[in-house]
Amino acid sequence: MASADIKSIGLFIDGNYFKLIDNGLKAEARRVNVKNLIAFIQQSIAEKYELDPGSCIVTESHFFRGRYKAYDAKKLNLLLEDRKFEDRLIENDVVLHYKHVYDLPDGTPHEKGIDVWFALETLELAMYRDFDFVVMITGDADYEMLARKLKSLKIPAILLSWHYDNQDPTAKALKDEISFQININSLLKADPSLINKITEAVSVLKG
């Protein structure tokens, strides 16, 4: 285990899922405040496990997503938006993991192997970094077995879910395997002011 004083948290972010959250906030002229969201995760774990809030620290954050090559992103007018999005992650010491996106013959964007990379990297780092907790921001059923494996290693697998769809897209198979869920939608219903703590207004920002 990690130090008795510090409880180490590994944070692993499904990039497509996270971008959908950010896109959903656009209608409110807001975006995720990465620093404050990380602080909220630390606070939530401390409350759930009755720990000193100052002892729960996200020691590593990793982000996984497919990305267009620079030329393709520029052609699709995505280059600046994507780089500004990445800047926010980098400013908060989030490690970026990318594979190139390719278009299928029918024009559908396709990314291969990101989910496998996410799972392998999460499991490997959970063991080698000796995390006390692993938090996943995702909703994909593909990570059901990852959550189960983490629990077999006596590492709580925590899910943060947040969606702007009419129905919760979080896979039931995944929810059945996690140790506990930080359900932002439910928390916002109970305390609407939370939105001001974990997001920020876009209009007043330069970047």
Region roles according to the model:
Residues F85-G207:
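Nuclease catalytic cores that cleave nucleic-acid phosphodiester bonds
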Residues M1-H110, P156, H163-D165:
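Domain-level signal for Mg2+-assisted phosphodiester chemistry and nucleotide/NA-binding surfaces
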